[in-house]
A protein has these predicted regions:
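Short His-Asn-centered micro-motif
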Residues: 10-14, 33-34
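Conserved Class I S-adenosyl-L-methionine
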Residues: 45-70, 75-128
Length: 128
């Protein structure tokens, strides 16, 4: 894609190449970045790991390059009840936690009902 050829970019739960985003965005264009907060799937992580690590929900903001700025941010939070074993298996399959945790811990999650908190941060970042 050509420099400054995009009015909108989106990064959803994925690593972001900030320099490439800046290169692609047209002046006044925006980047929608969606990522987990420290609360996201906390209940699942407690079942999978001996120690659940905290992290800073705003750490990525320090990576915003010159020529771009955070224009708006919101967090969406809700509880999700997973009573069905297939739903719990699907959740594990779509998160990195399902790959990192032991087979024993994954099986224990699949075998028992689980309520999880979904917590997603939405950032709107604009190109100057």
């Amino acid at each position: 894609l050509a420099d400054a050829s995009c009015d909108l970019l989106a990064s959803v739960f994925s690593p972001l190449d900030w320099a490439e985003a800046r290169r692609l965005l047209a002046p006044g264009g925006g980047l929608l970045r969606m990522g987990p907060t420290h609360e996201h799937l906390w209940d699942l992580r407690e079942r999978l790991y001996d120690e659940v690590r905290e992290y800073d929900d705003e750490k990525h903001l320090a990576l915003i390059p010159d020529g771009m700025h955070l224009a708006h941010s919101e967090t969406l939070t809700y509880r999700l009840q997973l009573d069905d074993a297939q739903a719990r298996s699907d959740l594990l399959a779509m998160t990195p936690h399902g790959w990192r945790a032991s087979a024993e811990r994954r099986a224990a999650v699949i075998d028992a009902p689980l309520a999880v908190r979904v917590a997603i941060r939405y950032d709107w970042i604009e190109r100057d």
